[in-house]
């Protein structure tokens, strides 16, 4: 297996006002003054909190990302943020394609593709999310479903380095439910994603692209997950809102 740097990414979702974000950022900076070799740490707060977190989390080795972006550079797009805006606030990553964006805001694969291309062109790293519903899982077509999401969402993406994109597999039935796909389940789909990336970008690039697992990832299961050959970290929801839990995941991933 290629030597890929693990990525533990926290998605705060719509949690923490500015004061709460400052407190959590302070706690994370104190808990993670350094991180284990071979592990990278990322937090993605709500847009309103990005500048606060950026200022408070330094000099801890924690990267900053956003939870959403719009593909146009500027203009009459009320409520949206551009890639350059996110960069100017200190972001280096951005989550796209999360099931909550797809389900609640009716975002399509085409939307994710536009976002991915805009982010890469701006020098930001898209964390492209994909995953199946319980209905698709029970129908047995989940691998095909996820592979099709990857093909559509990353079609035509021009990358020259594997660190220019991250893929996060999040089975929808495991997000915020306490249910977790087994490490074997995660490996099955993450492995299929890797094979798809090889078809799209060639073996050398695909072997370096990080594929994360998300969906009730927590301190108790992170070590088992990242032990699998095609699971390169986690996109963490609820556990990322508690500094002690998130820091514990980072440490355990690096053991």
What is each stretch, according to the model?
Residues 1-255:
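Active-site loop-to-helix "anion-binding N-cap" substructures in soluble metabolic enzymes
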């Amino acid at each position: 297996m290629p030597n890929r740097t693990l990525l533990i990414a926290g998605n705060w979702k719509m949690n923490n006002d500015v004061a709460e974000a400052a407190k959590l950022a302070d706690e994370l900076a104190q808990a993670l003054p350094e991180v284990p070799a071979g592990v990278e740490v990322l937090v993605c707060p709500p847009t309103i909190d990005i500048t606060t977190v950026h200022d408070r989390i330094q000099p801890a080795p924690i990267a900053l990302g956003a939870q959403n972006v719009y593909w146009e550079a500027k203009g009459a797009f009320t409520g949206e943020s551009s890639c350059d805006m996110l960069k100017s606030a200190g972001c280096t990553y951005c989550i796209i394609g999360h099931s909550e964006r797809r389900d609640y805001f009716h975002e399509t694969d085409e939307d994710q593709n536009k976002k991915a291309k805009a982010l890469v062109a701006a020098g930001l790293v898209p964390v492209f999310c994909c995953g199946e519903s319980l209905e698709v899982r029970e129908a047995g077509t989940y691998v095909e479903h996820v592979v099709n999401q990857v093909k559509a969402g990353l079609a035509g993406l021009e990358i020259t380095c594997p660190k220019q994109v991250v893929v996060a597999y999040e089975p929808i039935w495991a997000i915020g439910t306490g249910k977790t796909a087994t490490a074997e389940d995660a490996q099955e789909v993450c492995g299929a994603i890797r094979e798809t990336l090889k078809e799209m970008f060639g073996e050398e690039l695909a072997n370096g692209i990080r594929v994360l697992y998300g969906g009730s990832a927590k301190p108790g299961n992170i070590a088992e997950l990242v032990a699998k050959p095609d699971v390169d970290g986690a996109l963490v929801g609820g556990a990322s809102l508690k500094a002690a839990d998130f820091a514990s995941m980072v440490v355990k991933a690096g053991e």
